[in-house]
Amino acid sequence: MKPISPLIIAVWVLVSGIVGFGYSTFAVNNGLEVPISGITLALSTALIAVVLLGLAVPIWKYKRSITKALTTSKPLPVNPFYAVRVLLLSKAAAITGAMLIGWHAGVLVKQFTAPVVVTDATTPNITALVAAVLLLIVGFVVEQICKLPSDKSKDE
């Protein structure tokens, strides 16, 4: 499976940023409020990132024990289906993080360019933006953890 391209992530950020800015502009022009993310979105996004990192720990331990030869006995292998599920979850988390980053960045640009900046409306969106960045970073890190080590027998 190919790793996620940074170009794909950038496209998701750009597209969702345009949508976030466009919807915010549409809402304000029609007398509605600027969309504000609840604090629960930031908390649940951060929790998903922590859980994903926790799911990758057994894979990281197994990979480390193989590459560094910390034990004399062969380590217990990780279920390959488990590893694939964690890998797919990390890819989904990275793309979701990119979409949330773009959305919140677009909304924040609209909020900061408004004639009156309401601090109560920007704080939850900034918090959600930080949580989305965390989710994106964890998605990339876990994807690297799930990468197979190079086979040394092919090199010889």
Task: Label the predicted regions.
Residues 39-61, 136:
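Hydrophobic alpha-helical membrane-embedded segments
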Residues 94-114:
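Alpha-helical transmembrane segments and their membrane-interface junctions
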